[in-house]
UniProtKB/Swiss-Prot annotation:
It catalyses: Random endo-hydrolysis of N-acetyl-beta-D-glucosaminide (1->4)-beta-linkages in chitin and chitodextrins. GO terms for biological process: chitin catabolic process; polysaccharide catabolic process. Keywords: Carbohydrate metabolism, Chitin degradation, Chitin-binding, Glycoprotein, Glycosidase, Hydrolase, Polysaccharide degradation, Secreted, Signal, Virulence. The keyword Transcription does not apply. Belongs to the glycosyl hydrolase 18 family. Chitinase class V subfamily. This is Endochitinase 1. SUPFAM superfamilies: (Trans)glycosidases, Chitinase insertion domain. When expressed in tobacco plants, chit1 confers resistance against Rhizoctonia solani. Residues 383-407 have a biased composition (Polar residues). The gene is chit1.
Amino acid sequence: MPSLFAQSLAIIATLQATLGLATPVSAPDTVIGKHAGGYVNAVYFTNWGIYGRNYQPADLPASQISHVLYSFLNLSNNGTVYSGDSWADIDKHYPNDSWNDVGTNVYGCVKQLYLLKKANRNMKTMLSIGGWTWSTNFPAAASTAATRSNFAKSAVTIMKDWGFDGIDVDWEYPADDVQATNMVLLLQAIREELDAYAAKFAQGYHFQLSIAAPAGPANYNKLHLGDLGKVLDYINLMAYDFSGSWSNSSAHNANLYAIRANLNAPFNTDHAVNDYIKGGVPASKIVLALPIYGNSFQKTNGIGKPFSGAGDGSWENGIWDYKVHSKAGADGIYDDGDKGYYSYDPSVKELISIDTPDITKDKVTYLKSKGLGGSMFWEASSDRSGSQSLIGTSSNKLGGPDSTENLLNYPDSKYDNMRKQMA
């Protein structure tokens, strides 16, 4: 999963394959195989977002969210999973936190997320492990039964200590068949450890297991899709970063289709979704991951044209948060064929490909028509509020998020206040 562009620049090698053309599905909201609890409406929350971005757990639109994917935890090559920022995760004292509590207690984002869970019983929290920057040790961590067991046990230990509802693995990406096989074995080990913990301390509760998955065929063709579909609850298909500063021409960041050949679109969401389903992943387990940011192109004559440079960004060059992307003098252009949107300023020749509420509605209509599991967003701090919120737009179009309840009772947590449910 991104940091996003410092990481995305390294994806150049994955952006070589060209997808075939796709025919759009019909527009009506045809619902196929809807989950009993409703649709997923998940979002990544980054622990580094509490710093410069000043985006705190309490800022999450919790009532509109089914899953918060808390990113990221790190891992060692022996499989041990650990906090990459303990101050943000468990130490930071928020305004209502006491400095005089007795015992061993957890604070930071972990406590704040638990309090959100108590107030919003349909919001589940997932520990997200890895990400683009911290995927280096996955091959070693997944390579033996011992390291896989170490990963599973250490991940589940943190999960129960922190009061979370599941684990999300973000391995970017298995490089060959051996690693793809080991990925499945790692996930199976995690599933077994989750079930063993539930049997002992949370009988009847199902801890969830998901992964972040690539939308580029050069990466997903290496995966054992059918096996992943069996062991996982959800596959969050990262249908974004289809183009960027590494590209040869400006293009959509996250288009649904690629029916206009002149746009030089290297990827499209529909092609990836169909390939995952053909590969054996149940459609209901595919969650469509959407961007809350835009990629920019400088000195270009329009979409599908050459460009020179990525320009500035909100936090990294070439990436604009959705909430601040609007530029004076730029025209907004909705591509009804490929289902993409971009702004273009002819005076400075700047193009920014970004999703909007209308595009989000199109994508929710699409995922419903395909029988997919729901939506996921990267990442929370980039969104707007109110009617312009992409997370909120998705939630409303889905009919509200998945209503299955979270877990509040963690009797085996090492933290006194977690065992007491923050009473």
